[in-house]
Regions:
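Acidic/polar, low-complexity intrinsically disordered N-terminal segments immediately downstream
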Residues: 4-142
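Ser/Thr/Gly/Pro-rich, low-complexity flexible regions
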Residues: 126-280
Length: 280
């Protein structure tokens, strides 16, 4: 039988004399999801004794469709607490989940270590699909500066499915100067911007929808009105754990809309009030 380091009642035993207690960081089952174009990922190993250098053997127990290329050993320099195990995935396809199971062995692996010496990793490259043009209406910058919050900005939306959510993304409409409107009135940028307000770069809004609700990941807007870069995101999960005071957004699949209620999002400017975040 083996012990479960995640169990509440689990207390590690004493390591054998001189054993460094090398193990994986994290749970037995781990999920790794990466964006297209990324062909590797890192797993982290840790150890209890760090005075001397150490090496551990890595055995592949399961390599689904032979997607994974793994090193046979991982080494720690003297004094190092953690080390990286880099897994290459050169032939993985988008939108498919592959399983990798690894085991550690050697004189510095112990059944009494603080974590697992075997893990199972479910790996996937996210597959994005275009779902067409949508319209973003902003109530953060608008309320902060008193400009019209009902102005629609046309954005090209992509969608993917992760292990825990449905995810949407689109380029920041604030990182552009509006030069035209489409047939329904959507601007192709932020109509209150001038050229000098735009900060060159790539800025992407990412919204995760789960059973709890919709959450906007922290994002830089790509816009500066003289007080530093604008940024924003969901208050809950980033600035607060009080979901009653700072609710998540509401996803209406039938209507094809996501609505963020009052106090669900924050806005910040890097050089204003030390970059303080203000809920709206």
């Amino acid at each position: 039988t083996s012990c479960d380091p995640d169990a509440e009642s689990y207390t590690p035993g004493e390591l054998e004399d001189g054993n460094q207690g090398i193990c994986f960081v994290g749970n037995y089952t781990q999920t790794v999801e990466v964006e297209p174009g990324i062909t590797s990922f890192d797993l982290t190993l840790t150890r209890s004794l760090t005075d001397a250098a150490g090496t551990v053997d890595v055995t592949v127990i399961n390599n689904e469709e032979n997607i994974f290329v793994c090193p046979s050993t991982v080494s720690f320099a003297a004094g190092e607490k953690t080390a990286k195990l880099t897994v290459e995935t050169p032939s993985a396809a988008e939108g498919i989940t592959y399983n990798l199971q690894l085991a550690l062995s050697g004189n510095d692996v112990s059944n009494y270590s603080s974590g697992y010496h075997e893990i199972s990793v479910n790996f996937a490259i996210l597959k994005w699909e275009s779902i067409g043009t949508g319209y973003y209406l902003d109530g953060t910058v608008a309320n902060f500066f008193g400009v019209d919050p009902s102005v629609p900005m046309a954005v090209e939306i992509e969608k993917t499915t992760t292990a825990t959510s449905t995810r949407f993304r689109f380029d920041s409409p604030f990182a552009k100067v509006a030069t035209a409107q489409d047939e329904v009135g959507g601007f192709n940028g932020y109509p209150f911007n001038e050229e000098a307000d735009v900060v060159p770069g790539e800025y992407t809004f990412v919204i995760d929808v789960t059973k709890e609700g919709a959450s906007l990941k922290p994002v830089q807007y790509g816009m500066d009105w003289g007080y530093g870069m604008f940024s924003g995101g969901s208050v809950y999960g980033n600035l607060s754990t009080n979901i009653n005071s700072y609710p998540l957004g509401v996803y209406n699949e039938k209507a094809g809309s996501i609505t963020f209620p009052a106090n669900s999002l924050y806005v910040s400017m890097a050089d204003y009030q030390d970059g303080g975040a203000y809920p709206f």
